[in-house]
Amino acid sequence: MLVLKLTGRIFDEEDLVAKYAAIIRRIGGKVAVVTGGGEVARRYIAMARKGGASNTFQDLLGIYASRLNALLLISLIGDDAYPKAPSTVEEFLDAWRRHRVVVAGGFQPGQSTATVAALVAEAAGASVLLNAANIDAVYDDDPRRNPNARKIPTLTYDELERILKTSVVPGGYELVDPWSISILRRNCVTTYIFDGRRPEYVEEILRGGNPGSKITC
């Protein structure tokens, strides 16, 4: 069983989406995937914000963008995948019982896709979550703002929480959030953070490697 979180930025590059679909088809066992919204979400949210839309409506635009990305991935995976993007945990579980692969986007306003991935891992009873992120690992500071930030190969959720509280500008370091940390920690799910531009790292991790950061309880 594998739970895979894909940053929406992967969907900004056509070849990356196809490569992830091929890997999901190739690996054995059940696979749950949660997709972010990517450039489509950012662009629509920016336009809505400029026009005065509420935060809730902006969240909805992001959710539908993430589900559009989920449907694209579903179409590339083919018959192994549930043909819809579940919109609730209950719908995910129903699909999970009947299909080898289930791909979801966002669930509800105010909830990140990182939290959705944690909820999916919990619901599926997964022990491992792979997070194909927009950076290559966890650092002790945001590496895009601090060129001297230090990469951390292994850490605990408590340590990650301290880093996020002390070193990160909200919304600027898109890995996990407090809700997702709480869910993953209470279920003792091991999370691997790796560079989403390197889909081959999925299989490297499954072989026991750690190309980015490994987070444990």
Curated annotation (Swiss-Prot):
One Pfam family linked to the record: AA_kinase
Location(s), subcellular: Cytoplasm
Molecular function terms, GO-annotated: ATP binding; UMP kinase activity
Sites where the protein binds UMP: G37, D59, F107, Q108, P109, G110, Q111, S112, T113
EC number annotated for this UniProt entry: 2.7.4.22
GO annotation, cellular component aspect: cytoplasm
Disulfide bonds: none
Swiss-Prot/TrEMBL catalytic activity: UMP + ATP = UDP + ADP
Keywords: ATP-binding, Cytoplasm, Kinase, Nucleotide-binding, Pyrimidine biosynthesis, Transferase
Family (UniProt): Belongs to the UMP kinase family.
Functional description taken from the UniProt entry: Catalyzes the reversible phosphorylation of UMP to UDP.
Complex formation: Homohexamer.
Protein name: Uridylate kinase
UniProt source species: Pyrobaculum calidifontis (strain DSM 21063 / JCM 11548 / VA1)
